[in-house]
């Protein structure tokens, strides 16, 4: 039985969601006694991390969009049963850096795959599990890509080779999801100063936990 809460963190490349999460968790630990788990997709467990390497390998430029989607779905399933569900059943507060919405935005809006197919695969992999809250960090594609290019410590992966048009479609996909699920997905302006973005995210999380 699930007694914990699931919060997912989403955003286009360069939105800074991972950085926000790194700063958010220590602040949250000062305010709640609940045990907190942070993890990521694809990855989080050994099998899923191996799949992550396959997906991001810069040499795999011939990967078909459906192959890419199925790899993400496989990684999601293993991560869920091995790490996420046990934590939720133990009453923990679980944060996942990317989850089901990423597939709809990237492989759906970005790659042009049929949304209904992606939603079915998501439901198949998760047994219908949905986040209690999704923090969507929004940033224009031009700004996001500029941030990526300015980060010299970031290792280039296959997805960094995509055109700006694909990144723009991904963002539109996310914004459409936010309109479709207004109660679950909150949109946060990620162009604001980091401290302000973290503060807004913290407020939304605390609102969920205190409801």
Swiss-Prot record:
GO cellular component, one term: cytosol
Residues binding ATP: 11-18
Pfam families: Thymidylate_kin (PF02223)
Reaction catalysed by this enzyme: dTMP + ATP = dTDP + ADP
Keywords: ATP-binding, Kinase, Nucleotide biosynthesis, Nucleotide-binding, Transferase
InterPro entries: P-loop_NTPase (IPR027417), Thymidylate_kin-like_dom (IPR039430), Thymidylate_kinase (IPR018094)
Gene Ontology molecular functions: ATP binding; dTMP kinase activity
Taxonomy, superkingdom: Bacteria
EC number: 2.7.4.9
Gene3D superfamilies, sorted: P-loop containing nucleotide triphosphate hydrolases
SUPFAM superfamilies associated with the record: P-loop containing nucleoside triphosphate hydrolases
One BP term from GO: dTDP biosynthetic process
Keyword Kinase: yes
Its biological purpose: Phosphorylation of dTMP to form dTDP in both de novo and salvage pathways of dTTP synthesis.
Stated family: Belongs to the thymidylate kinase family.
HAMAP family assigned to the protein according to its UniProt record, in alphabetical order: Thymidylate_kinase
Protein name: Thymidylate kinase
Biological source species: Streptococcus pyogenes serotype M3 (strain ATCC BAA-595 / MGAS315)
Phylogenetic placement of the source organism: Bacteria, Bacillati, Bacillota, Bacilli, Lactobacillales
């Amino acid at each position: 039985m699930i007694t914990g809460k699931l919060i997912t963190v989403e955003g286009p490349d360069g939105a800074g969601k991972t950085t926000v999460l790194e700063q958010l968790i220590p602040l949250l630990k000062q305010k709640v006694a609940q045990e907190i788990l942070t993890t990521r997709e694809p990855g989080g467990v050994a099998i899923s991390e191996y799949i992550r390497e396959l997906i991001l390998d810069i040499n795999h430029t011939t990967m078909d969009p459906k192959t890419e989607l199925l790899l993400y779905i496989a990684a999601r399933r293993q991560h869920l049963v091995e790490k996420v569900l046990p934590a939720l059943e133990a009453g923990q507060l679980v944060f996942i850096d990317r989850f089901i919405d990423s597939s709809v935005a990237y492989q759906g809006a970005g790659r042009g795959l049929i949304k209904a197919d992606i939603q079915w695969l998501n439901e198949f992999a998760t047994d219908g599990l949905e986040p209690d809250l999704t923090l969507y960090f929004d940033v224009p594609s031009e700004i996001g890509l500029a941030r990526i290019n300015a980060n010299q410590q970031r290792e280039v992966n296959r997805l960094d080779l995509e055109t700006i048009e694909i990144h723009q479609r991904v963002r539109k996909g996310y914004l459409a999801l936010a309109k479709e699920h207004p109660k679950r997905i909150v949109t946060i302006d990620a162009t604001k100063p980091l401290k302000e973005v973290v503060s807004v995210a913290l407020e939304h999380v605390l609102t969920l936990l205190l409801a």
